[in-house]
Regions:
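N-terminal chloroplast transit peptides
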Residues: 1-32, 41
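Acidic, low-complexity intrinsically disordered regions
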Residues: 13-15, 32, 46, 102, ...
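Intrinsically disordered, low-complexity linker/propeptide segments enriched in Ser/Thr/Gly/Pro
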Residues: 34-48
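Soluble ligand-binding/transfer domains with enclosed cavities or grooves
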Residues: 49-246
Length: 246
């Protein structure tokens, strides 16, 4: 991992931190701010690779905000190129081998998943902006998704087990418990583990996984931001919120 000068870290994090603090809205000049940040970082003589990543992150966060976390469906396509640009700069190609980075509590700032955003639901039952969290345990074996609805009065959760694949970036997910407020709903135990391919000897997922299972690939990871792709083609951009809640 590159170690940029202290002044550069402070300059960049002031932009990113202000975005965190404001929760869901950036000023219309966010993209111009990113360009100004580029000048500041160049002046601080930061390593070029780190500089490029930080600028791409600030621009992506601005575009996520403009798309309303993905709720503005017609703006989603504009976010994809910014995601792909950052994925190409991924400093951690095998995130499963860096549990100290991948674990923790992450806050969702953009997704293309209508169900995660609650768009099919009545408006009061949609998650509050900035209140969709995902916690990954220290050993990367458990994940907890949390959302708050009804103006934050009710919390829904979904807990799942993670099984890593051999590529170092993909996990198979098996949900084992859901809760709606105080009501816990266990999921019947299902054999979701990987099977051994007779031809290659590699572990592969079952041909017909159950509906409460999925696949998630981490395509970008650093200390503050994560990008993941799901098996149904959905994109997820998350920022670090704090320590894991599982």
């Amino acid at each position: 991992m590159l170690s940029p000068p202290r002044a550069t870290v402070h300059a960049t994090m002031s932009v990113v931190s202000s975005w965190y603090d404001r929760g869901t809205r950036l000023s219309p000049a966010a993209d111009a701010l990113a360009e100004r940040q580029q000048v500041e970082m160049t002046a601080a003589d930061a390593p070029a690779e780190w500089q490029q990543v930080e600028i791409a992150k600030v621009r992506l966060l601005a575009m996520c905000e403009a798309a309303g976390m993905g709720r503005e469906v017609n703006r989603r396509a504009k976010v994809r190129p910014a995601i792909q640009a950052l994925e190409a700069l991924n400093p951690v190609p095998r995130p499963l081998e860096s549990p100290e980075l991948l674990s923790g509590c992450w806050r969702l700032v953009f997704t293309t998943s209508d169900s995660i955003l609650g768009l099919p639901r009545a408006r009061p039952f949609r998650p509050r902006p900035g209140r969709i969290l995902q916690s990954i345990g220290p050993d990367l074996s458990v994940v907890l998704n949390e959302e708050w609805v009804l103006q934050g009065a009710l919390k829904n959760t979904a807990r799942a087990r993670l099984v890593p694949r051999d590529d170092g970036r993909t996990v198979d997910i098996s949900f084992d418990r859901f809760s709606i407020g105080w009501l816990r709903i266990p999921v019947p135990a299902l054999a979701v583990g990987l099977r051994k391919d007779a031809r290659t000897g590699r572990r592969v997922p079952p041909a017909n996984p159950p509906r409460n299972a999925g696949v998630l690939e981490t395509t970008f990871l650093d200390e503050t931001l994560r990008i993941s792709r799901g098996d149904k083609g959905n994109l997820f951009v998350l920022v670090r919120q704090g320590p894991s809640r599982v």
